[in-house]
Amino acid sequence: MAAKDGASAPGKSGAGSGSEALMRAALSAVAPGTALRDGLERILRGNTGGLIVLGLDKAVDSMCTGGFVLDVEFTSTRLRELCKLDGALVLDKDITKIHRAGVQLVPDASIHTEETGTRHRTADRVSKQCNFPVVSVSQSMRLIALYVHGERRVLEESAAILSRANQALATLERYKLRLDEVAGTLSALEIEDLVTVRDVTAVAQRLEMVRRIATEIAEYVVELGTDGRLLSLQLDELIAGVEPERELVIRDYVPEPTAKRSRTVAEALTELDALTHTELLELPVVARALGYSGSPETLDSAVSPRGYRLLAKVPRLPGAIIERLVEHFGGLQKLLAASVDDLQAVDGVGEARARSVREGLSRLAESSILERYV
């Protein structure tokens, strides 16, 4: 991943979803395989520097003095040649046109910056004052830095990013293997009605660990551009179904609201996301994020699923029907004990669908028990 200054703590939201989305879009724009990245590499090879604003509005216009207006089509060779001039370049936000060249950027000097070089100080201040990314190419240090709302990323060679990405992918594979184990155990315990809060917490913990490492790899994919195609395919295969499973587990086990404690599915997911990596390793802390007390007694207490997760595995069963089945029967054990006639009592469930649900649940129950004991 590109080097990051002032990163937020793991598991915590940093500069905000807006800035994060803008940073991802900017990283994608300068990724290998793009015309902009090709132009930046040409600038480095030519032993020159550059300062490029990726967007133009009134705020950027007010900071520009001198130079000249071009409004020509963007190409990597034009970028390279125009960066030989003193001054900055201003592109459109879609990086299809070069609006201005040779301009001097004069941002508010009172804006704090910890950068030292003139070009980098200007890039940092401009990025904080406007809503567009700014790219600074250092001639002396031979590096490309990207600034978004004051956050700085130094772009690296694909080989360095791929090395870390492959390590992260190996970690994801181990995490996913362990997740499959604990999820399989949970399914078998659900059939036998032997689930404890500890079992649920272990699955929620593993799902969150997988989600986080997958998010990290997804950032590598963005930064790698065309070089990350194979990595993207591997990631998609490994995390298929993980995000829906995460929500289904919470929906199955989030405690019923009480006078002292109440937590929605969305709140539980937010609480899990807010945990640091250290907190995520503590089962009592994860249990509290789900809405339980987190005491040793609570971890060993019995709980019963509502049935969302198992019903979601029944083929061709719409979400609306799943909601009605859960609402009608109130729990997985009653669903498992329901006959075809009982299932038909639910609005929208005819004889064919009732048989499909009955057979699907029976097959899932048999396979879960076999996987646990064979």
Label each region the model flagged.
Residues 2-276:
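Divalent-cation
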Residues 244-346, 351-374:
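Long, highly charged, low-complexity intrinsically disordered interaction regions
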